[in-house]
């Protein structure tokens, strides 16, 4: 994640410059991609914001593992809930902007000189496809965070249970604690032996952790669904780019074959001219050889 945006977007400026150079070299008016790249920059800024929030969630999750106080867990829960809500908001904005970019690309193909396979179209399609791939990386990162949080929550509940009861909880007990959050029901023996006040903080802490994990998981599932909605767009752009590259490759192949055939024709033409010259020269030589013996007789007749 640290290097996710450090160098990925440098190519967009290069692609823009290349598209403009291609248009100039082909004798066409340079296509205006400024608005397109301005929209791309907006998407990039939102994606960087999502990355920052992801790091904040990571840090809060790490801090939560070392906390043993229900009040502090509650504070961290509120912070993480806020971060996830911001992530959802930004990702939904990114989705809308990606869809708008894809629509703009489709409209651009109707402009003269910007049709499928043109340098402008290849640039637009490549950039949108690249943005989609970065979103895929983000999606995988959040899925990984969600899995880690669930696994770490389970480990924390196991440790707290052992600390209070001195017993190793079986898998079913841990699953029941995690699914219900009703830790008091599973700690009756400890409450009877130590008193409710002795373990109240731990019970509250487990409850806060349960509520935090469930709420964050619900939001992360919603976030994942938004990512999945964008996956179709990413796949479509990737396939479109592959189709364009395939057409360009085929066109280049046809051009190369045409050039080779033209070169062969020129060589054949040169060869034909050469042999024609040889034939004419041979005819002249033969004619001269036939004419020389008869030349005295012809001269006598002329006299």
From Swiss-Prot:
Residues 107-126 are annotated as: Disordered. Pfam families: SNARE, Syntaxin. Residues 301-303 are vesicular. One of its GO terms (cellular component) is transport vesicle. InterPro entries: SNARE, Syntaxin, Syntaxin/epimorphin_CS, Syntaxin_N, T_SNARE_dom. It is found in: Membrane. SUPFAM superfamilies: t-snare proteins. The modification N-acetylmethionine is found at residue 1. Part of the t-SNARE complex. GO terms for molecular function: SNAP receptor activity. This is Syntaxin-124. Vesicle trafficking protein that functions in the secretory pathway. Belongs to the syntaxin family. Its main location: membrane. Disulfide bonds: none annotated. It comes from Arabidopsis thaliana (Mouse-ear cress). Residues 1-279 are cytoplasmic. Residues 31-112 form a coiled coil. GO terms for biological process: intracellular protein transport; pollen tube growth; vesicle-mediated transport.
